[in-house]
């Protein structure tokens, strides 16, 4: 077992009850282009076209053969583009349940499949896009092979669902998915889970189980990779979400593309935080209708630490998100708030009275409690960074744009979510995730 000591479990109110309910009917779904790092689409459909679930919507020009398929059948109601014609979202108005059939196999045949067969099946169905590389967090190049594949069967994000509750409903499909993944690598398939949890073991010795304990980010895949298979420019691993492993298992044994998604709808502004069964790319406004408290709320696809805020073109459940978080917009001003004791304010540096109430849960809002200022190294970053990385030095070099030093300090091991806690505790109010992405892009382009 690997025990994480540094980190932070955010004491936020509104944790979900770990019970699964059917969500409301979803009439609009979308595939979000900006979730795929470096992707340039070659469109195969246009507005007004009728599509079936599993039908290809566009192909990646930079990664020929990588298809992005429809998560539902219906009509293409909108193709939204941003600056420089960057694809933001392809919106589908759901109609019917027609789907593209795929070849399927008996469970005992999965171990005999070649890697070419597995890759072809994943590419044509669109499930190849569920895989991501580390470093760079990109969709893998077809034909490549990773040193290892990681599945995080635990989640320490604030307000997250318990993955074991979800996996237990589809344990057979999950194990079939693991079998398929072993055909894609000569190394290990790492399943990382919380310490003390009873996990059904796969019979294939290529699948290994690793226990992690401790505060967030103990459940992040970046933490698991750092301790088990550290990456570099010459060593690449892949990772995939546990619900996508279930979808892979169903694809190969049933011949159908599963786009079901169980998400945690939670946060201080949710009336009854719970787990909802919905579909990939679901409209967040439809998913949360009638379930939120009155007021000016911010709906977030993903975690409050690293998710994507609701907007007109991005108001849909993200491809890699397992939760929908709702907090209050912090628009109000507080007179002399900086001199008040702050019983209802959380602080990691003991500057408010709320720090001394260890079991208190706080109704966090979007208020930053101050504006941007100089980066102040007072030890906050080291408190929440469990990786063997000099956090302050790395963040300083990221802000300075020093790619050589940032690479030497370990930035290739990181993704935006790995620096989310550093952003949260930063006295200077810096957003380190976008800065890291710019540096990673520059490193990749420079080779």
From Swiss-Prot:
Q: Which UniProt keywords apply?
A: Ion transport, NAD, Sodium, Sodium transport, Translocase, Transport, Ubiquinone
Q: Which reaction does it catalyse?
A: a ubiquinone + n Na(+)(in) + NADH + H(+) = a ubiquinol + n Na(+)(out) + NAD(+)
Identification of the protein by name? Na(+)-translocating NADH-quinone reductase subunit A
**Entries under InterPro entries matching the protein:** NqrA, NQRA_2nd, NqrA_C_domain, NQRA_N
Pfam families (alphabetical): NQRA_2nd (PF24836), NQRA_N (PF05896), NQRA_SLBB (PF11973)
User: Which GO BP terms apply?
Assistant: sodium ion transport
| Protein EC | 7.2.1.1
Molecular function terms, GO-annotated: oxidoreductase activity, acting on NAD(P)H, quinone or similar compound as acceptor
Top EC class for this record? translocase
Relate the assembly described in the record. Answer: Composed of six subunits; NqrA, NqrB, NqrC, NqrD, NqrE and NqrF.
**Where does the record place a coiled coil?**
none
Q: Do the record's keywords include Translocase?
A: yes
**Classification of source organism:** Bacteria, Pseudomonadati, Pseudomonadota, Gammaproteobacteria, Enterobacterales
Role, per record: NQR complex catalyzes the reduction of ubiquinone-1 to ubiquinol by two successive reactions, coupled with the transport of Na(+) ions from the cytoplasm to the periplasm. NqrA to NqrE are probably involved in the second step, the conversion of ubisemiquinone to ubiquinol.
Q: Give the family, as the similarity comment puts it.
A: Belongs to the NqrA family.
Q: Does the keyword ATP-binding apply?
A: no
Native source organism of the sequence: Yersinia pestis
């Amino acid at each position: 077992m690997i025990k994480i000591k540094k980190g932070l479990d955010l004491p936020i109110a509104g944790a979900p009850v770990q019970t699964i309910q059917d969500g409301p009917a979803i009439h609009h779904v979308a595939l979000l282009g900006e979730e795929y790092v470096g992707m340039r689409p070659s469109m195969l459909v246009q507005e007004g076209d009728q599509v079936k679930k599993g039908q290809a919507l566009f192909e990646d020009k930079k990664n020929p053969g990588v298809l992005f398929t429809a998560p539902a059948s219906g009509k293409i109601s909108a193709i939204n583009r941003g600056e420089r014609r960057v694809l933001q979202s392809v919106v589908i108005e759901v109609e019917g349940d027609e789907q593209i059939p795929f070849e399927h196999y008996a469970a005992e045949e999965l171990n005999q499949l070649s890697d070419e067969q597995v890759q072809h099946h994943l590419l044509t169905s669109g499930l190849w896009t569920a895989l991501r590389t580390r470093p760079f967090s990109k969709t893998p190049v077809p034909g490549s092979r990773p040193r290892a594949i990681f599945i995080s069967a635990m989640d320490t994000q604030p307000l997250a669902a318990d993955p074991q509750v979800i996996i237990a409903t589809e344990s057979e499909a999950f194990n079939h998915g693991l079998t398929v993944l072993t055909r894609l690598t000569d190394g290990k398939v790492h399943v990382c889970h919380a310490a003390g949890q009873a996990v059904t073991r796969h019979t294939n010795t290529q699948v290994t189980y690793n226990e992690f304990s401790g505060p967030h980010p103990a459940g992040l895949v970046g933490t698991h990779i750092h301790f088990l298979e550290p990456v570099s420019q010459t060593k690449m691993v892949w990772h995939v979400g546990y619900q996508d492993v279930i979808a892979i298992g169903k694809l190969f044994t049933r011949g159908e593309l599963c786009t079901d998604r169980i998400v945690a709808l939670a946060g201080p502004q949710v009336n009854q935080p719970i787990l909802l069964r919905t579909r990939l790319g679901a409209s967040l406004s439809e998913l949360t209708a009638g379930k939120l408290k009155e007021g000016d709320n911010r709906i977030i696809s993903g975690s409050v630490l690293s998710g994507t805020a609701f907007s007109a073109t991005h108001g849909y459940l993200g491809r890699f998100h397992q939760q929908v978080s709702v907090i209050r917009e912090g628009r109000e001003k507080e007179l002399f708030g900086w001199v008040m004791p702050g019983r209802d304010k959380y602080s990691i540096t003991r500057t408010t009275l709320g720090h001394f109430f260890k079991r208190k849960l706080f109704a966090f809002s979007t208020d930053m409690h101050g504006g941007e200022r100089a980066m102040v190294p007072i030890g906050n970053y080291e408190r929440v960074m469990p990786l063997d990385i000099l956090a302050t030095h790395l963040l300083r070099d990221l802000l300075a744009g020093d790619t050589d030093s940032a690479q030497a300090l370990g930035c290739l091991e990181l993704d935006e979510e790995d620096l989310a806690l550093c952003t949260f505790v930063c006295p200077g109010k810096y957003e380190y995730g976008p800065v890291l992405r710019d540096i990673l892009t520059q490193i990749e382009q420079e080779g």
